[in-house]
């Protein structure tokens, strides 16, 4: 929030005594404090990615509008992607988990999955910009090994790698519709992204 916007809200509250204005001001200041703390502690990338998920306009499920704690890890999902982290990131948390994510995190044999090349943040941003300039409705990032073509929403992939640019990306060999997994060597951040169906 800017100093000008804060001043205007205080003036409006003084004039109307509308508690909704004061509540909005408090929420805005709390958000600013969280962002400052994240930046100071070097956690802004994970926080930014989680906020991209909980703030997804396509996310129509209210219970996924905020993150929650799962086994001590901050977790967020929107039906397309999920991020869970053990890092102490300052984001808004709800009290109860809206869904049991344990089945998504256990028993899939991550180490046995096939590794995909991890694109750079710069390459993803360039792809999004080029597709937008060409008037495309959305942007798809495609891995093609000659036998399997796997496509994902480029913006969602960018969000996942914003949380951890050096994550290893793995997939079920030969399955273009199975979930794609992201992991870092220290297991601080773990993610899942669903692919987009495209013509073979």
Where are these regions (language model features)?
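DNA polymerase processivity clamps
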Residues: 2-200
